[in-house]
Amino acid sequence: MKIKVVDMPYEQALAQPREKHTPPRRPSMLFRALLRALSAPDLRATHFRCDRVGMERLGPDEPCLVLMNHSCFLDLKITAAVLYPRPFNIVCTSDGFVGKAGLMRALGCIPTRKFQPDTALVRDMLYAVKKLKSSILLYPEASYSFDGTATPLPESLGKCVKALGVPIVLLRTCGAFARDPLYNGLQNRRVNVSAELRYLLSPEEAAEKSADEINALLADEFSFDNFRWQQENGVVVNEPFRADGLNRVLYKCPHCGTEGETEGRGTELICRDCGVRYRLTELGALECENAEAKFTHVPDWYAWERACVREELEQGSYLLDAPVSICVMVNFRQICRVGEGRLRHDANGFRLTGCGGKLDFTQKPETSYSLYADYFWYELGDMICIGDRDVLYYCFPQGNGDVVAKTRLAAEELYKLKRAERAAKNG
């Protein structure tokens, strides 16, 4: 999938009119049927099946909140099939509306800015379930998994569940990540995909629980490990490109400690600095071919990288300072490519400068619990996004080495550290 991009001077981009808020629309039966029909070929190719658990508790015309894990673009096609003919609105990233806002609204999409405060979102969701009598599809992780494990959930989720006052349904997929992991550059593998659609909480059950209790329940439901699932279920991925781009996730060599010198190509991940070589097996495990393996499991390696980043933050040595190509979004007409600059990230948060000295934007560490970061974003490149309600800045690192995953890890760990500091200060 691509996105409309226009070259434009920075001042001209910022001078564009802002997008006016528009209430959600209930998707028509025609669009629901069309989306289902368009989804059918890919689902047939994956021999898709869905198990339904407790769904007899949900009335045929009763709106609900569907919470789904987010693995790849196939997720939406799965939802179109398993929820049909039930009408549902989809909470999606605002840049998905660029160049096609009318179509997205007709499909029932509700735009939101990832990892940015959005007070209008809950109002739109309430409008959908109360006025439109439509269900809501929400990906609470708000981003694709890098390493095949769950990403953090927002603390506001429990409050949102209670505010909506509708049944909560969980849609969990298996095989979608193994078929199309984000790091692998949109190369689909031959993997069967399945899902479970499960009635989780009635409105009455949700009302009896505190927001914190609901958060704990959902955190448990969204704990998963796709690589472990692949190994335990003997799911074979024998494509010769299965390790392509794995360096985007495993960017730091555990043997020599060098960052940005790993390279995933074919079935192997190598370190160009020390020469260590790993093979990603057909079952998704790691085998070291010329040394004693430090890790045999991709998520364990990624967790080690997270621990290393946290240690850097605690010691005050963490720093990202990278040249970037910069795009901005101020409305749904287009993404504006505005020039070059530098993105700095340290204990004080983000600072983006550039466009001949005209751009100087900062974002504090406490702004969000995570970071909008993506690989091969709309086929433009690996991307880090910061911003506010007015403007979103899409930064594409231009230097050597993979910095996107580390930056997201750092943003998440820095948020935790700042929250802990504030809690300690307040007693």
Task: Please place each PLM-identified region on the residue numbering.
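Soluble catalytic domains of membrane acyltransferases
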Residues: 27-31, 43-216, 232-233, 240, ...
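A broadly conserved sequence feature marking short terminus-proximal activation segments
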Residues: 191-259, 389-402, 407
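Cys/His-rich short segments
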Residues: 238-292
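Long, charge-rich boundary regions
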Residues: 277-358
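Short, surface-exposed beta-strand/loop "edge" segments at domain boundaries and coil↔beta transitions
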Residues: 277, 334-336, 357-361, 388-402
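Acidic, Ser/Thr- and proline-rich intrinsically disordered linker/docking segments
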Residues: 366-427
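Structural motif
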Residues: 265, 346-348, 380
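Helix-enriched interaction subdomains in cytosolic or periplasmic regions
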Residues: 16-39
